[in-house]
Design a protein with these regions (language model features):
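Exposed, flexible binding/inhibitory loops of compact, secreted disulfide-stabilized domains
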Residues: 18-147
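Bacterial N-terminal signal peptides that target proteins for export
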Residues: 1-8
Length: 147
């Protein structure tokens, strides 16, 4: 009986360890794009979709996918995104982020949006997971689901 409970304990421990694996998410690019729109979080699965966003980055779509956070539009130069945290659990990914206005007020410019592009391994892609972006004060910015 003791042997059975020891094996059961070991099995539970292994399941917990496998479930707690660390995922390496890389911030590949940050910048601006002139593609019109508002605040969005987008899942990018191919080079064509990435190009339509006006983002040019060397993503290897065979083994990874992109997550792009676009914020704006702005009509003054100098806005940039600050990402405070990214937390994930089996139901959702929560990004806490905001935009920092230029200290000098910026210069007038044609409308643009700031973006941050993350690269995520395909091995963690789970259809239906909610991806949400909120401000540090918990106000919603954008949300989507992994298609």
């Amino acid at each position: 009986m003791k042997r059975w409970s020891a094996l059961a304990g070991l099995a539970v421990g292994l399941v917990l360890l496998v479930g707690c694996r660390e995922v390496r998410v890389k911030t590949l690019a940050a910048g601006t794009t002139t593609v019109p729109g508002g605040n969005q979080i987008l899942i990018v699965r191919d080079a064509v979709a990435l190009g339509k966003l006006g983002i040019h980055a060397p993503v290897h779509f065979k083994g990874e996918f992109g997550v792009a956070l676009l914020m704006g539009p702005h009509d003054r130069t100098g806005y940039k995104q600050i990402v405070e945290s990214i937390r994930a659990n089996p139901e959702r990914v929560r990004v806490v982020a905001f935009e920092q206005a230029p200290a000098d007020g910026g210069e007038p410019s044609p409308p643009y949006r700031s973006y941050t592009l993350w690269i995520v391994p395909n091995s963690v892609y789970r259809r239906g997971i909610r991806v949400e972006v909120v401000t540090p004060s918990n106000e919603p910015i954008a949300a989507t689901y992994l298609p």
